[in-house]
Amino acid sequence: MARIAGVDLPREKRVEIALTYIYGIGLSTSQKILSTTGISPDARVKDLSEDEVNEIRTYINKNLMVEGDLRRDVALNIKRLVEIGSYRGIRHRRGLPVRGQKTKTNARTRKGPKKTMANKKK
């Protein structure tokens, strides 16, 4: 099993898809990696030689921020926004949507399950 950036890639999948299991690599980045290294996107992970795996590994290490480093960077960016008290930081702190979505009816993922209020008597 090929291990790249601390992630075991699934052996039966195509290389193009398997690379997307690494945090920070999507389909377009995966295609770019394979075109640069000259590896066929249709090849299966189990069919890759050790040299090809090393070539992918070195490309990712040199040119991309993935997995732990990327997660840490994102967390530090959010922490910085919270500390400086920006609007986005306040939204993060309160657990509300950050990018301008409405919150009167939607935003259940961010706000959690509904908290029902008791009806007022008329």
Swiss-Prot record:
It comes from the Bacteria. Part of the 30S ribosomal subunit. Forms a loose heterodimer with protein S19. Forms two bridges to the 50S subunit in the 70S ribosome. Coiled coil: none annotated. GO terms for cellular component: cytosol; small ribosomal subunit. GO terms for biological process: translation. The lineage of its organism: Bacteria, Bacillati, Bacillota, Clostridia, Eubacteriales. GO terms for molecular function: rRNA binding; structural constituent of ribosome; tRNA binding. Residues 93-122 are annotated as: Disordered. It comes from Clostridium botulinum (strain Eklund 17B / Type B). Signal peptide: none annotated. Belongs to the universal ribosomal protein uS13 family. The gene is rpsM. Keywords: Ribonucleoprotein, Ribosomal protein, RNA-binding, rRNA-binding, tRNA-binding. This is Small ribosomal subunit protein uS13. SUPFAM superfamilies: S13-like H2TH domain (SSF46946). Located at the top of the head of the 30S subunit, it contacts several helices of the 16S rRNA. In the 70S ribosome it contacts the 23S rRNA (bridge B1a) and protein L5 of the 50S subunit (bridge B1b), connecting the 2 subunits; these bridges are implicated in subunit movement. Contacts the tRNAs in the A and P-sites. The keyword Zinc-finger does not apply.
